[in-house]
């Protein structure tokens, strides 16, 4: 499945907008995720964590991966910038807003807008964007309590797309609280038990090594539940 091109020089630098096809990545890292796509397409949810120290290019790699998945594999990709977030409710708000603003599948977007019509407002003058209204705790709490059902319903609207790939960029703040560890572990367990082979979805979390170790140890994940992809060297 590795049919994309890797170039000799990375054009990524702060403030430099480039074509994703020019990205120089670590081919083995990208392949370590892509090789699981057949499982995801069959409805088996997968969870990955990309670890590396600050400045290692984790965000750039996730951007490139998003491009590859959308362009070559008919996957919907959603990326959440999660820096500084330390609670699950804020994470869910950012996920819903990212879905509303970035999903290119009209039927899925319409379904989301219908479901959340009482909780959504538009902001901006040039290019309107959707956001969740400040007083929406009841909605966010209900999604947090039954996140597997939310994901299952999301996947039911894929139509001609093969899967959804959600990138949560930076879980370092969330790793500070046991509530996230417990919530995500419960989500992983229940998604598989309740909706086995019904949810073609994958998650990629990015983290510093020490924070991932804390989450893995506290959550007692097994090797089949979360796949760790170690990014030890920066891009050059």
Spans of model-derived segments:
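The catalytic "switch" region of P-loop NTPases
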Residues: 1-2, 15-18, 160-167, 171-236
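A short, basic N-terminal segment
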Residues: 1-48, 68-71, 211
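P-loop NTPase nucleotide-binding core
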Residues: 44-180, 201
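Short, solvent-exposed loop/helix junctions and linker helices
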Residues: 23-27, 85, 234
């Amino acid at each position: 499945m590795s049919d994309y091109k890797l170039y000799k020089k990375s054009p990524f630098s702060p403030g430099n907008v480039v074509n994703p096809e020019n990205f120089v990545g670590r081919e083995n890292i990208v392949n370590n995720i892509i090789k699981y796509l057949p499982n995801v397409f069959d409805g088996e949810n997968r969870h990955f964590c990309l670890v590396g120290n600050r400045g290692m290019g984790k965000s750039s790699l996730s951007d490139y991966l998003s491009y590859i998945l959308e362009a070559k594999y008919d996957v919907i990709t959603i990326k959440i910038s999660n820096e500084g977030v330390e609670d699950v409710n804020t994470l869910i708000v950012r996920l819903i807003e990212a879905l509303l603003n970035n999903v290119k599948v009209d039927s899925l977007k319409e379904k989301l807008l219908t479901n959340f019509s009482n909780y959504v407002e538009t902001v901006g003058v040039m290019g309107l964007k959707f956001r969740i209204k400040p007083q929406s705790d009841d909605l966010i709490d209900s999604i947090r309590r039954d996140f597997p059902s939310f994901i299952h319903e999301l996947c039911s609207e894929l139509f001609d797309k093969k899967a959804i790939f959600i990138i949560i960029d930076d879980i370092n703040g969330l790793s500070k609280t046991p509530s996230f560890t417990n919530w995500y572990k419960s989500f992983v367990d229940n998604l598989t038990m309740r909706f086995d082979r019904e949810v073609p979805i994958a998650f990629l979390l990015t983290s510093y090594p020490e924070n991932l170790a804390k989450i893995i140890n506290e959550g007692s994940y097994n090797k089949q539940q979360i796949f760790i992809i170690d990014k030890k060297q920066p891009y050059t």
